[in-house]
């Protein structure tokens, strides 16, 4: 039995299969412009998993009315036909195709129809990268891929301590591995191509223990010498 995650609003599938080779993608011009603006390449996205030699798969997509991220898709013998509200809807349709391809042996796709639309406009997740657990860039890229396939469209990176590389203060965290501004820009572009808004979440003094421990900033602490609890 085929499954698509998140579960779409409507999904009907048959026992018939269609060969799924390297895709030939044709987009409505306005939809193509939207994908280019986001840095999303549906042709390359499909080519990651549609690789059956000798069978080109026609994929056509056009715009329809509706909420952001909505799509309607038919997989037929003559190819894949997608209607979507925007680039995000096309991306979600393509990722649904990925899931169907993984579940179908031999490089085929099932003949089916899928219709879906987000129930929530903002579908967010917050990832804590503070307190001595800053991920490597490849880990963050992998997580962004996963979040995109889950149709997360808002990602906050929670930062506490020395998570961000402030050039003027590098002498304070020479032994740390903070993310640089350039790395954040790369992550933002990578997320945008998966229709995710990347939102850095920088805490202020209430959660800046590592900064306030330094003599240069101790005067900003509410209690410069720390707290002592008696009679506990």
Locate each region found by the language model.
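Acidic, contiguous N-terminal accessory segments
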Residues: 1-118
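Substrate-binding cleft of carbohydrate-active enzyme catalytic domains
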Residues: 120-232
